[in-house]
Structure formats: C-alpha cells, structure tokens
C-alpha cells in the first residue's frame, strides 16, 4: 500500500509541474502578442540597407590601372584581371576584368585596398539566378549601376525595423 501512495504523490507532483511549465509558456506567448510583427513582406516591402552594406561590387573601367592589388588581397584570388603592357608608354592597359559572384564571399577587401577607388560596394543583393554561370560578371556587367530601392515606386521601403523589446 505504501508504494501506491508514493506513486500517487509523484503523479500529483508531475501534474503540478507540467501545469506550471505550460503556464510559463503561455505567459511568454501572451507577452509577445502585443508586439509589432518583425517580419516584412519581402517582394513588396524591402528594408533600406545601411550605408556600409556589402552588396554587389561596382567597377569603373576607366579608373582601373591593372595593378592587381584586388587579386592579391582577395582571400580566394577571385577577380580575373587581363591586361596588356603598352611598351611605348610603359603602362598596363586593362583588357578584361571579371568577378564570379557565385564564389565571392563579399568580404570587401578588394574595395578597401584598391588604390584608385575603381571598386565600390553597392546596395544590390538580389543576385540569384537559375544558372550559376550567369553570376560571372564581366566589366560591362560590373559597371552597370544598380537601381536603387528608393527609386522603385512598386516597392514600399521600410527605413527602420521596429525595435525588439526583450
């Protein structure tokens, strides 16, 4: 008879403990009920990126002196720089410049160490394609200026996300 009483007491304690845990979870749920939603409706609403956002790289062909500093500081030796030495003026002439964004880690070293500032980071982050070979951008594609999110009238921009209260 004694073991049956202890089992009944354990059952009662477990029931009380379970009810307490459910109550704690329910209180957390209720505390989040009066907060604003954090999610945004992505294709129709977009956040304004910060000033130092590291998006797609913009390249200015005329400023580049083909020094290949960007290739040396890149952790994965990504930029492909093709140049030809002009013997009469003893300078390099840039022939081709390309970056494969399928491999790029967007670290920003190439932009930071470029002596002529011909590379810059843009706010463009929508680079997804169905074919990975389309992510290999040449100097013409890199020179294209991105359309700003603010200028697109079909998208509602959200300047700052509501702060999350902890």
Curated annotation (Swiss-Prot):
Protein name: NAD(P)H-quinone oxidoreductase subunit I, chloroplastic
Family under the similarity heading: Belongs to the complex I 23 kDa subunit family.
Catalytic activity: a plastoquinone + NADH + (n+1) H(+)(in) = a plastoquinol + NAD(+) + n H(+)(out); a plastoquinone + NADPH + (n+1) H(+)(in) = a plastoquinol + NADP(+) + n H(+)(out)
InterPro entries attached to this UniProt entry: 4Fe4S_Fe-S-bd, 4Fe4S_Fe_S_CS, NADH_quinone_OxRdtase_chainI, NDHI
Cofactor(s) needed for function: [4Fe-4S] cluster
GO molecular-function terms, A-Z: 4 iron, 4 sulfur cluster binding; iron ion binding; NADH dehydrogenase (ubiquinone) activity; quinone binding
Subcellular location(s) per record: Plastid, Chloroplast thylakoid membrane
A Pfam short name: Fer4
Sites where the protein binds [4Fe-4S] cluster 1: 64, 67, 70, 114
Free-text function comment from the UniProt entry: NDH shuttles electrons from NAD(P)H:plastoquinone, via FMN and iron-sulfur (Fe-S) centers, to quinones in the photosynthetic chain and possibly in a chloroplast respiratory chain. The immediate electron acceptor for the enzyme in this species is believed to be plastoquinone. Couples the redox reaction to proton translocation, and thus conserves the redox energy in a proton gradient.
UniProt organism field: Venegasia carpesioides (Canyon sunflower)
Quaternary structure and interacting proteins, as annotated: NDH is composed of at least 16 different subunits, 5 of which are encoded in the nucleus.
UniProt keyword annotations, A-Z: 4Fe-4S, Chloroplast, Iron, Iron-sulfur, Membrane, Metal-binding, NAD, NADP, Plastid, Plastoquinone, Quinone, Repeat, Thylakoid, Translocase
Domain of life assignment: Eukaryota
Uppermost EC category: translocase
One GO CC term on file: chloroplast thylakoid membrane
Domain 4Fe-4S ferredoxin-type: residue ranges: 55-84, 95-124
């Amino acid at each position: 008879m004694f073991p049956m009483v202890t089992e009944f007491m354990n059952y009662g304690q477990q029931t009380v403990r379970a009810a307490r845990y459910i109550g704690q979870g329910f209180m957390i749920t209720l505390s989040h009920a009066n907060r604003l939603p954090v999610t945004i409706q992505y294709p129709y609403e977009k956040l304004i990126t910060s000033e130092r956002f590291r998006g797609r790289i913009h390249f200015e062909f005329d400023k580049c002196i083909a020094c290949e500093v960007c290739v040396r500081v890149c952790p994965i030796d990504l930029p492909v720089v093709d140049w030809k030495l002009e013997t009469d003026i003893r300078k390099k002439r840039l022939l081709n410049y390309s970056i494969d964004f399928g491999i790029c880690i967007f670290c920003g070293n190439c932009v930071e160490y470029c002596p002529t500032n011909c590379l810059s980071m843009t706010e463009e982050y929508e680079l997804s394609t169905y074919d990975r070979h389309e992510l290999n951008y040449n100097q013409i594609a890199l020179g294209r200026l991105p359309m700003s999110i603010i200028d697109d009238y079909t998208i509602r921009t959200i300047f700052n996300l509501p702060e999350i209260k902890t």
